[in-house]
Amino acid sequence: FKSLTKYSPGRQN
C-alpha cells in the first residue's frame, strides 16, 4: 500500500 507511506513514512518505502 503506497498510500500507507503518507501515514507511516519509512515503513513501506
Curated annotation (Swiss-Prot):
Tissue: Expressed by the venom gland.
Coiled-coil segments on the chain, per record: none
Major site of localization recorded for this protein: secreted
GO cellular component: extracellular region
Alphabetically ordered keywords of this record: Neurotoxin, Secreted, Toxin
Domain of life: Eukaryota
Compartments where located: Secreted
Family named by the database record: Belongs to the scolopendra toxin 7 family.
Name of the protein in its database record: Scolopendra 6940.74 Da toxin
Organism, as annotated: Scolopendra viridicornis nigra (Brazilian giant centipede)
Organism lineage string: Eukaryota, Metazoa, Ecdysozoa, Arthropoda, Myriapoda
